[in-house]
């Protein structure tokens, strides 16, 4: 298997290959400094400096079974990871330089997806109370009670905050196949942003609020599998002016987590 870490620049509509690996690497986050990317592979976390691309291991202590749901705090001081243990996936925080993880999620399974712009709240998805579907939740960075935001039927996933923190974008299959939805950061005013025949996942608004990036699967796809023909699409934040900008083999692990450059000029995948 070969994996490719790439960057798409909006202005030039060009692709730059950062790294090629002979194993599976996934889910790039762009660090706030703009100088490196964070990726996962083989249950571990790696930092990739853009000036001299290579995979530098990040110390995650006992957490050695990471999935592709990880991210960096807005101020760059913390990393959140989702690590599999006996209860399933759990969320932990650790220093950005690495260190021993601190458990955040009071229950499991939990998968992180978004960080509020003020750095105080985490958005994630979880299965609770015997429900067979996944809902969107939030919790403070210091732990405490979790708040369930989605209540209806259907699988909801991939929550990510608007740059002003007022809204959360997510995908949900409540009305059939997965489409892009948006709601208030408190769970209010849940509504489908648009509908088409594609199976749409993992919406990510750009830091400047000008664009919405999402992953599109072929019609009829169930879940978010890997190794399918997919497209990365851009839209306006209100769901208008949708267009496909890249097509390749991918899916699970392509853009599960926020991947925009800090200046909104590019995204990694």
Explain the meaning of each model-derived region.
Residues 7-24, 50-66, 94-109, 139-157, ...:
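Multi-bladed beta-propeller domains
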Residues 109-117, 121-162, 170-173:
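Solenoidal tandem-repeat scaffolds enriched in leucines and small polar residues
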Residues 2-5, 44-46, 87-92, 131-137, ...:
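Structural motif
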Residues 197-233:
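Loop/turn-rich, solvent-exposed surfaces of beta-rich toroidal or solenoidal domains
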Residues 31-32, 37-43, 79-86, 115, ...:
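Beta-strand C-termini and the immediately following turn/loop, strongest in propeller blades
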Residues 32-33, 74-75, 117-118, 163-164, ...:
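Residue-level detector of Asp-centered blade-edge/turn motifs that repeat once per structural unit
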Residues 251-269:
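Blade-level signature of beta-propeller repeat domains, shared across WD40, Kelch, NHL, RCC1
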């Amino acid at each position: 298997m070969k994996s490719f870490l790439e960057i798409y620049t909006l202005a030039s509509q060009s692709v730059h290959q950062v790294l090629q690996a002979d194993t599976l690497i996934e889910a790039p986050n762009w660090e706030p400094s703009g100088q490196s990317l964070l990726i996962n592979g083989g249950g571990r976390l790696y930092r990739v400096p853009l000036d001299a691309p290579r995979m530098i291991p990040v110390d995650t202590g006992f957490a050695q079974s990471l999935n592709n749901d990880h991210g960096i705090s807005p101020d760059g001081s913390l990393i959140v990871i989702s690590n599999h243990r006996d209860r399933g996936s759990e969320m932990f925080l650790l220093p950005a330089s690495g260190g021993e993880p601190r458990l955040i999620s009071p229950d499991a399974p939990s998968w992180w997806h978004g960080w509020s712009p003020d750095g105080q709240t985490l958005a994630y998805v979880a299965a609770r109370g015997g429900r067979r579907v996944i809902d969107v939740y939030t919790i403070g960075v210091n732990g405490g009670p979790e708040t369930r935001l989605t209540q209806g039927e259907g699988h909801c996933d991939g929550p990510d905050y608007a740059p002003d923190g007022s809204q959360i974008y997510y995908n949900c299959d409540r009305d059939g196949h997965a489409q892009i939805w948006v709601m208030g950061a408190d769970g209010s005013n849940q509504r489908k942003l648009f509908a088409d025949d594609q199976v749409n996942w993992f919406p990510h608004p750009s830091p400047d609020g000008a664009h919405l990036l999402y992953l599109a699967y072929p019609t009829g796809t169930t879940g978010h599998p890997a190794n399918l023909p997919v497209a990365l699409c851009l839209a306006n934040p209100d769901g208008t002016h949708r267009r496909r900008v890249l097509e390749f083999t991918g899916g699970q692990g392509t853009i599960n987590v926020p991947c925009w450059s800090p200046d909104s000029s590019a995204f990694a995948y």
